[in-house]
Swiss-Prot record:
Disulfide bonds join 12-15. InterPro entries: GLR_AS, Glutaredoxin, Glutaredoxin_subgr, GRX_bact, Thioredoxin-like_sf. Keywords: Deoxyribonucleotide synthesis, Disulfide bond, Electron transport, Redox-active center, Transport. Pfam families: Glutaredoxin. GO terms for molecular function: glutathione binding; glutathione disulfide oxidoreductase activity; protein-disulfide reductase activity. The lineage of its organism: Bacteria, Pseudomonadati, Pseudomonadota, Gammaproteobacteria, Enterobacterales. It comes from Escherichia coli (strain K12). Monomer. Belongs to the glutaredoxin family. The keyword Protein biosynthesis does not apply. Gene3D superfamilies: Glutaredoxin. This is Glutaredoxin 3. Residues 2-83 form the Glutaredoxin domain.
């Protein structure tokens, strides 16, 4: 199974949607909350080049945000990455 990491904020609806999609596929993921954690937020920005959440990584490959995750799934590209 792939190593999935997702940077989140507690009140972010897109974070909840992304986690719901991953959970619906039976995927375990490491949630990395950035709420009140400046160091974790800086780590996310350095890794992804983006300041918005969620930011999703599968086996250290940057996938992007929630819309990127859903688009990847719609193209049939998500499931192969999760194996």
């Amino acid at each position: 199974m792939a190593n999935v990491e997702i940077y989140t904020k507690e009140t972010c609806p897109y974070c909840h949607r992304a986690k719901a999609l991953l959970s619906s596929k039976g995927v375990s993921f490491q949630e990395l909350p950035i709420d009140g954690n400046a160091a974790k937020r800086e780590e996310m920005i350095k890794r992804s080049g983006r300041t918005t959440v969620p930011q999703i990584f599968i086996d250290a490959q940057h996938i992007g945000g929630c819309d990127d995750l859903y688009a990847l799934d719609a193209r049939g590209g998500l499931d192969p990455l999760l194996k």
